[in-house]
Amino acid sequence: MCEGINWRNLENWKEAFDILEERDYNKIVVKYLQERTVVEILGKDFYEDVHKNASVICKADLQGKHIGLIGETSYDLLVNFCAILYTGSVAVVVSKDLTAKELNKIVEQAEMSALIYDIDQEKICLQVDHNVKLIAIGRTDISDVLSMEEERKKDNFHIVNNTHREDMVNISFTSGTSGKNKAVIHTNGTLIAGTFPDVFGEDFNSLLVMFPFHHVTGFVLPLVGLSQGKTVCIGSGFQNIYRYLRLLKPDCILLVPALLESICRKLKKHTQEELGWNLKLIVCGGAKCPVYLFEIVMKRGIIMKQAYGATETLGRGIICRVSSGNLDSIGRPGYLMEANLADGELLLKGPSLCAGYYKNPEETSRTFINGWYHTGDLAEVDEEGMYYLTGRKKNLIILSNGENVSPEEIEQKIIKHKEIKEILVREERGFIGAVIFPEYPK
């Protein structure tokens, strides 16, 4: 919890980070692995890094502009994300898996003035056609690309942030490249409301962050940790999850069902002590989770929670502490959130609700009505106020990794082949499949 901080009075993220720096000056706020060595970062060092990178942004005449961020989940990516917020600019985190064509489309859609990237993304970033300033997080040999590593060695710039709660600071894209991307607008106010108040309703000391930053969970969880005085353990890639659990020893982790299943395979065979883990709380979200996984977790004495949210609400919405009596329910509205039903569709409302979709008034007016976000999910509620998902209003497939896939888009691409007459794309046992009727030669 963020005791002593009245988050409702915070105007912007410079105010927020300045307060957090003073509170956590000599506290470990971030941990990550460098090879097999655990690196621990104190608050004074983390926020000094944020100040330095924010100075580079201002000296490059980018303050207040839309700045893209692309790369692997890392300490450097977190510092740059926070630096963009600190200056009152707009952070637009994009997937590192985009093609050059897709990246150009998003650069144009989000009206980016600059793109900050880790060095592994340099090749694709150099293919951006628009007049965008490029900043490499590390060193670069490209003459017209700024090096954040070199520029931050220069004197700091005195930063003034005059933005207010209603000013935009983040554009997030819904779903992956396989669904129609909508650019979600978050303001100082919605991002503060989505991270400072209690999220999980349980006590914990450190949380593991592995999600890509272009997923809302990827950048919200670190801000939750920083704002609530927890240690943020940063992992890069789900494939190394067991190393992170063993060496960084977080006591809280948020997972999608596919990862929870992997965790449960270990927990069925070993105790946490044998594994070297320290988990007290597991939160599962992103897609419907098989109830038998909950039972495995709870048998090990770990608190199990199921969460339901969206990019539009910064992941907040409905949450449930799983017990033997409510395995099928997604729970009740979380702290500060409200839920309702309209013609069977689940609606959400709360202070972390986004300000709409960027440059898309038609979709905004369809999705947000009288302050309520229409999720597109169908649900039921019982007499105790517990919600249960029953289906999708829109025909989307939600994979076990949380990604939304539009079957119609896949069908439209495959049907172009002259050998195919009809196609039906569907989900079965966690995989996407298709029923195809060939166009036989006459």
Model regions: which residues?
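AMP-dependent adenylate-forming
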Residues: F17-L42
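Conserved pre-ATP/AMP-binding loop-to-beta segment of ANL
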Residues: N26-I28, R152-F173, K180, F200-S206
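Conserved AMP-binding/adenylate-forming
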Residues: V39, V56-L98, M210
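Conserved AMP-binding A3 loop
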Residues: E40-G43, V169-G194
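ANL superfamily adenylate-forming
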Residues: E122-R165, L267-H270
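Conserved AMP-binding/adenylation subdomain of ANL enzymes
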Residues: I192-S206, F213-N278
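Gly/Ser/Thr-rich phosphate-binding loop
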Residues: D251-L255, I263-N326, E338, K421
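Conserved ATP-binding/catalytic segment of the ANL
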Residues: P333, L347-L399, N404, K416
